[in-house]
């Protein structure tokens, strides 16, 4: 165990604190219910990290974590969504309300779960249940201090106020976007969902299927994806029964076979690592440490990094109608970016359906992130080469009056 690994484990699961004990044991939590002791009592060296302290005998070294906004804080089975202003028409936005003098997070979540609603909103001594809708879309978070009123039944929890609600997502599935089928009539155009491998194509297909209600197809056939619910996987890519076609192809002939395309672009540093993990660990697996340290990784970067650039350049050059979507923008603002994608596909954008997708955006096709490398696998020479490819793609995008690559692509 190392401090980094423990912190990463807890942060990935959405906890506020990480604690280490006995030099090797990692604990996660949302609150600290013990008093401070002298730091000298934490005297055990981390078993996986010489020179660092990982608690002691019945003593925890505790770290407060800086969570990314997307990180999901959890209380039992419920996922913390944030602090939000009371909606204008409360009874329409959140149709079930119950007074709870002895309010706690668990009590409100249990009530809404029992009533089969995916949202539980705590408002002081009132609990409200409902769905994310245009009346209550959960898009404008407020400062959590505005919701910091303590629960009457649990002093370490916040229960919101009559004006500012603390919102949790229950385990109840929002079924408004779960129906999927093949197109009722053969499509008159072939639309590609094009990406470099590792850029999130499988995840994007999941989002598109939920948002449109139609299956996506593939230029290839992957039996494991078919078995996980991608029923369009078995159809020939020209069948016309699917809303769009997954492809990693980048040749002129292959590109010109499509009438339009959604071009999904991802930070090459992240895409290369994701594809390397897939190649050696499956769609939601991870490459072994030996693969990163062996000859496989340098050879992979040497072969795949140029392809990352030429893939985008070819689609921009030969594509008939190309909508560029950056993976990072899709993660950051799914509602807007997915709406753009659905519009290109010729399907009416239903806002309530997009809100439903937001609550189930990960599906079962995202790597958990719990096995991150503790070092940067990119050498200085690799970074120099990849940075040149990033600048090349950025210039090509701007040359077509499109937004360039996101700022976090560089510098590293």
What are these regions (language model features)?
Residues 318-344:
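Phosphate-binding beta-loop-alpha motif at adenosine-nucleotide cofactor sites
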Residues 24-25, 107, 126, 133, ...:
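Non-catalytic cap/lid and distal C-terminal segments of serine-dependent acyl enzymes
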Residues 173-325, 370-412:
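PAPS-dependent sulfotransferase catalytic domain
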Residues 99-102, 123, 198, 202, ...:
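Intrinsic disorder
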Residues 1-176:
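Peripheral, non-catalytic regulatory segments
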Residues 212-213, 337-351:
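Non-catalytic, well-ordered alpha-helical segments in soluble enzyme domains
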Residues 217-218, 347-357:
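Short, surface-exposed acidic
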Residues 5, 107, 202-203, 307, ...:
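Acidic, Ser/Thr-rich intrinsically disordered and amphipathic helical segments
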């Amino acid at each position: 165990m190392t401090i980094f690994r423990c912190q990463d484990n807890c942060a990935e699961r959405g906890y506020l604190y990480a604690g280490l004990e006995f030099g090797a044991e990692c604990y996660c939590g949302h609150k600290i219910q013990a008093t401070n002791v002298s730091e000298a009592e934490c005297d055990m060296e981390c078993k996986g990290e010489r020179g660092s302290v990982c608690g002691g005998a019945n003593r925890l070294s505790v770290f407060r974590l800086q969570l990314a906004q997307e990180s999901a804080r959890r209380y039992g089975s419920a996922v913390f969504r944030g602090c939000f202003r009371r909606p204008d028409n409360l009874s329409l936005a959140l149709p079930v309300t119950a007074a709870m003098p002895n309010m706690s997070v668990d009590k409100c979540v249990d009530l809404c779960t029992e009533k089969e609603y995916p949202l539980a909103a705590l408002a002081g001594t009132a609990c409200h249940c409902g769905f994310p809708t245009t009346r209550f879309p959960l898009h404008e978070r407020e400062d959590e201090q505005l919701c910091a009123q303590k629960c009457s039944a649990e002093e370490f929890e916040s229960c919101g106020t009559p004006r500012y609600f603390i919102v949790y997502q229950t385990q109840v599935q929002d079924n408004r976007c779960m129906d999927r089928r093949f197109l009722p009539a053969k499509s008159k155009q072939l639309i590609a969902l094009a990406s470099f491998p590792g850029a999130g194509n499988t995840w994007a297909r999941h989002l598109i299927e939920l948002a449109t209600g139609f299956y996506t197809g593939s230029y290839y056939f992957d039996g494991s994806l078919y078995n996980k619910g991608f029923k369009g996987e078995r159809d020939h890519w020209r069948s016309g029964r699917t809303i769009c076609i997954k492809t990693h192809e980048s040749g002129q002939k292959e590109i010109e076979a499509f009438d339009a395309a959604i071009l999904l672009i991802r930070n090459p540093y992240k895409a290369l690592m994701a594809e390397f993990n897939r190649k050696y660990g499956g769609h939601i697996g991870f490459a072994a440490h030996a693969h990163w340290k062996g000859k496989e990784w340098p050879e992979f970067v040497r072969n795949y990094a140029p392809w990352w650039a030429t893939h985008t350049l070819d689609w921009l050059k030969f594509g008939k109608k190309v909508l560029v979507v950056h993976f990072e923008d899709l993660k950051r603002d799914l509602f807007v970016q997915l709406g753009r994608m659905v519009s290109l596909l010729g399907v009416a954008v239903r806002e309530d359906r997009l809100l439903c997708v937001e609550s189930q955006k990960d599906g079962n096709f995202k790597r958990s992130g719990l096995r991150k490398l503790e070092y940067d696998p990119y050498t200085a020479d690799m970074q120099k080469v990849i940075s040149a490819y990033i600048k090349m793609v950025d210039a090509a995008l701007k040359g077509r009056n499109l937004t360039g690559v996101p700022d976090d692509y560089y510098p590293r």
